[in-house]
């Protein structure tokens, strides 16, 4: 039985261990870059629960899935976009956990007043492409990068304008991993 819950500073070690358990290929898919253990530790140190929302999925023993929501700069307070980073432990995949984490992220982002949710991922990550399309996101692929843009205030297939905006996001892609390694949190 899995338990989804919001995470805070007390969960840093669980987050670190979860991300360290990811294989090099999994880390590349999660962060869109090759990441060593030091990078993971700096990334976790840079997480700020007062700024970011962290949703964790725990089994009986440890954190097996993580959604990280970060607010992106956008057109003002009424035009908030949330970027989501997602990771699921290898042995827990293909069980709907990614979908559950995304649904929880979507509900949390909507409750916080966000208008859109964006997910960047490697175009070779077919599971993420399928998941984001099932959520109703506009997905644009350009080379080895893909971006999914989800309008949080509408249901159904994405309109053409959202698809075009997703295309512009791919062109200006800057991953969520711009975390200051010296930041003290």
Show which residues each predicted segment covers.
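Residues that cap or delimit alpha-helices
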Residues: 8, 23-24
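A short beta-loop-alpha structural element at the N-terminal edge
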Residues: 2-14
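Hydrophobic alpha-helical core bundles mediating ligand binding, dimerization, or RNAP-core interactions
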Residues: 15-19, 23
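Short catalytic-loop micro-motif centered on adjacent basic/acidic residues
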Residues: 30, 118-119
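Terminal substrate-recognition subdomain of acyl/acetyltransferases
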Residues: 86, 121, 126-185
């Amino acid at each position: 039985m899995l338990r989804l819950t919001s995470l805070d500073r007390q969960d840093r070690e669980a987050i670190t261990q979860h991300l360290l358990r990811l294989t090099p290929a999994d880390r590349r898919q999660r962060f869109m870059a090759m990441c060593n253990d030091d990078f993971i530790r700096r990334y976790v140190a840079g997480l700020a629960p007062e700024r970011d929302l962290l949703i964790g999925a725990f089994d009986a023993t440890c954190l097996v899935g993580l959604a990280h929501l970060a607010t992106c700069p956008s057109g003002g307070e009424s035009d908030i976009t949330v970027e989501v980073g997602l990771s699921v432990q290898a042995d827990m995949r293909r069980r709907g956990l990614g979908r559950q984490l995304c649904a929880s992220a979507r509900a949390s982002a909507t409750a916080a007043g966000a208008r859109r949710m964006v997910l960047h991922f490697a175009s070779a990550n077919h599971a993420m492409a399928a998941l984001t399309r099932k959520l109703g996101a506009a997905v644009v692929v350009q080379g080895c990068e893909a971006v999914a843009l989800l309008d949080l205030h509408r249901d159904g297939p994405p309109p053409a304008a959202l698809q075009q905006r997703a295309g512009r996001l791919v062109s200006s892609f800057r991953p969520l991993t711009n975390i200051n390694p010296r930041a003290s949190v």
